Structures are given as structure tokens and as C-alpha cells.
Amino acid sequence: MKVSAALLCLLLTAATFCTQVLAQPDAINSPVTCCYTLTSKKISMQRLMSYRRVTSSKCPKEAVIFKTIAGKEICAEPKQKWVQDSISHLDKKNQTPKP
């Protein structure tokens, strides 16, 4: 009787632990950068070094984060024409092999 009670207790503990592990999100430890405010000012293409898109479902807005030559990160609205033009410019710039 004591063995079956101990076994039942052990199984319940294991089941509780397993459900907690399975209920966690897939990327619980991966950091997510979100943009909460987007710039309305056009940034000169000469000041831009790179960009990345923010598309995580954990973020309230889709955005593009531009990194400037000075190291600043600026959030922008991806649907604006100047943002799309800047992305195209950076893509072309990064595809061109440097001598």
C-alpha cells in the first residue's frame, strides 16, 4: 500500500513538471526588440549602415530598425516610401563586392 501511494505521488509530480515544461513558449529565452514609436522624419541614406525588420507577434507594431553610421538605432514605418527606398539602397549597397 505504501509503495503504491509513493508511486502515485511520484507520477503526479512528474506529470505536473511535464505539463509546465510543455506549456512554455518556444522562444522563451530569445530577446525580442520592439518599436513602440516610429520616426516620421526621413533619414538620409548616407547616414544608414544597415537595417532589420521587426515582425515578431510579441511586438505591437511591424517596423524597420535602421542602424546609422553613428551607431544609433531608429524605428521607422515599413510602408513609407522613403523606408522602402532606403531598404533597396542598403540591399544594393551590401550586394556590391568591395574591391
Curated annotation (Swiss-Prot):
Residue ranges crossing the lipid bilayer per the database entry: none
GO cellular component: extracellular space
A Pfam short name: IL8
Keyword Disulfide bond in annotation: yes
Keywords: Chemotaxis, Cytokine, Disulfide bond, Inflammatory response, Pyrrolidone carboxylic acid, Secreted, Signal
Keyword Signal recorded: yes
SUPFAM superfamilies in UniProt: Interleukin 8-like chemokines
GO molecular function: CCR chemokine receptor binding; chemokine activity
Cellular localisation: Secreted
Residues the record lists as Pyrrolidone carboxylic acid modifications: Q24
Protein name according to UniProt: C-C motif chemokine 2
Upper lineage: Eukaryota, Metazoa, Chordata, Craniata, Vertebrata
